[in-house]
């Protein structure tokens, strides 16, 4: 519009056009030059910043807050779970396949509601005492955020309420200076990772590597909807045939189905961990680590650490009720195979999600110190004969929620180096 009006004004209009154009040109030219110079400076600054960031993201091992290669090096920092707000999971097919028949009425009645409050209160007290003892032993203790697990959530494939943040071992595994979030397989545990994000982000900001495995959809195809469960005999037959409630529709695994011995990590195919999940871990950790699949005579495999618990270099507790099919692999490597004593937990004590063999689900503070249940005297004597000092803590009520000391913890930092114990 300005140019049209000026042209109508004759020669003065033309001069005005020339004047305005020249001024506008000089203004634009100056602006472009300044912008270009500013962009160059910003780019140079960004390059320097990125270079600095590159240097900052690879800390020396001694500076990284996350560093653990096995189950027995001196423990410096650990995450301990919470019993607060724990809910009974809805009685879905994957829960049914992982629990014993005598507890099915409990799940049918209480699914989606709190665990018995008195029992939960005792469990909270026990875990607080466990944390205090760990601190007295010189270990830094971190705790997940409190979460309201009663909230119902819905995805395009399912809806559920939550479970708890009691067992960090189930969802987190530390390999070197990397912390890996497992995808899980129970729908009630889909959002369990949220309780740990504050801690993990802190580790990440301080230099740790952080990986989240592919999150499964947990659609119906992940589960064998017709999985036949009628008796222990049925479970034995199915396990022997390699049949589980989870299919190979997509990768899934719980971190507790893996146990570490330096460069070698042992995993089992279970009700919550499929071969695709193990393969994802194998590819992700190669070539620095070797993932081996081992199996057991177990009618209900779920989490390896109450069946096969490595307590030192070349030393493993092997459950006599669930013998390892590949035990010769360890014998040939010169390992010491220890058979733990029969647990003495009373028959009437509720174990809604686990077996009595939580007695061997111990936490090594180092090669010469172990955290063991105060009630399990035979297990204590076994360790004492091995020259290992027992740190006795009562977590009998906490056991009812599905785990022992190893399950209730995730060792974040142990003082040690990457070695091979199988060659």
Curated annotation (Swiss-Prot):
Any one GO molecular-function label of the UniProt entry: amidinotransferase activity
Swiss-Prot/TrEMBL keywords: Acetylation, Membrane, Mitochondrion, Mitochondrion inner membrane, Phosphoprotein, Transferase, Transit peptide
Transit peptide, residues from-to: 1-43
Primary localisation category: mitochondrion
GO CC annotations on file: mitochondrial inner membrane; mitochondrial intermembrane space
Annotated positions binding arginine: 170, 305, 322, 354-355
Organism: Macaca fascicularis (Crab-eating macaque)
Entry's EC annotation: 2.1.4.1
Purpose: Transamidinase that catalyzes the transfer of the amidino group of L-arginine onto the amino moiety of acceptor metabolites such as glycine, beta-alanine, gamma-aminobutyric acid (GABA) and taurine yielding the corresponding guanidine derivatives. Catalyzes the rate-limiting step of creatine biosynthesis, namely the transfer of the amidino group from L-arginine to glycine to generate guanidinoacetate, which is then methylated by GAMT to form creatine. Provides creatine as a source for ATP generation in tissues with high energy demands, in particular skeletal muscle, heart and brain.
Presence of the UniProt keyword Transferase in the record: yes
Encoding gene, per UniProt annotation: GATM
Record PTM Phosphoserine, positions in chain: 46, 49
Subunit structure: Homodimer.
Name the UniProt record assigns to this protein: Glycine amidinotransferase, mitochondrial
Catalyzed reactions per annotation: L-arginine + glycine = guanidinoacetate + L-ornithine; 4-aminobutanoate + L-arginine = 4-guanidinobutanoate + L-ornithine; beta-alanine + L-arginine = 3-guanidinopropanoate + L-ornithine; taurine + L-arginine = taurocyamine + L-ornithine
Region (Disordered): 43-63
Compositional bias segments (type: Basic and acidic residues): 52-61
Example GO biological process: creatine biosynthetic process
Localisation: Mitochondrion inner membrane
Active site positions, chain numbering: 254, 303, 407
Pathway of action: Amine and polyamine biosynthesis; creatine biosynthesis; creatine from L-arginine and glycine: step 1/2
N6-acetyllysine carried by residues: 385
Protein family per UniProt: Belongs to the amidinotransferase family.
